[in-house]
């Protein structure tokens, strides 16, 4: 049974501006593991990566209905890729989390679907 859905879209230009104007932005948004991946990427891929993770985390908090808050902060949510490159969102929640991230030249978008198996 689907218990929540969320979607978020961000302009890459806006995220690039935040990264340039606020040196701590990357550390604020990304977990240590995400930062390690980020550091290994090309400049262009870094922008897509942080924008995609930003959008995925925003989509998740929309799906649970809380927004970024004390319950779910930026570092409570971690989005890494599995062995096939599929994004996996890790968080303490009793539900299956489906996440999809996509990029274009100007935007990053993410969708999260929360599913609970019937008991």
Curated annotation (Swiss-Prot):
Keywords: Cytoplasm, Fatty acid biosynthesis, Fatty acid metabolism, Lipid biosynthesis, Lipid metabolism, Magnesium, Metal-binding, Transferase. It is found in: Cytoplasm. GO terms for molecular function: holo-[acyl-carrier-protein] synthase activity; magnesium ion binding. It holds the Pfam family ACPS. Its main location: cytoplasm. It catalyses: apo-[ACP] + CoA = holo-[ACP] + adenosine 3',5'-bisphosphate + H(+). Mg(2+) binds at residues 8, 58. Transmembrane segments: none annotated. GO terms for biological process: fatty acid biosynthetic process; lysine biosynthetic process via aminoadipic acid. Its cofactor is Mg(2+). Its EC number is 2.7.8.7. SUPFAM superfamilies: 4'-phosphopantetheinyl transferase. GO terms for cellular component: cytosol. Belongs to the P-Pant transferase superfamily. AcpS family. PANTHER family: L-AMINOADIPATE-SEMIALDEHYDE DEHYDROGENASE-PHOSPHOPANTETHEINYL TRANSFERASE, PHOSPHOPANTETHEINE TRANSFERASE. NCBIfam families: acpS, pantethn_trn. Transfers the 4'-phosphopantetheine moiety from coenzyme A to a Ser of acyl-carrier-protein. HAMAP family: AcpS. This is Holo-[acyl-carrier-protein] synthase. It comes from Halalkalibacterium halodurans (strain ATCC BAA-125 / DSM 18197 / FERM 7344 / JCM 9153 / C-125). The lineage of its organism: Bacteria, Bacillati, Bacillota, Bacilli, Bacillales. The gene is acpS.
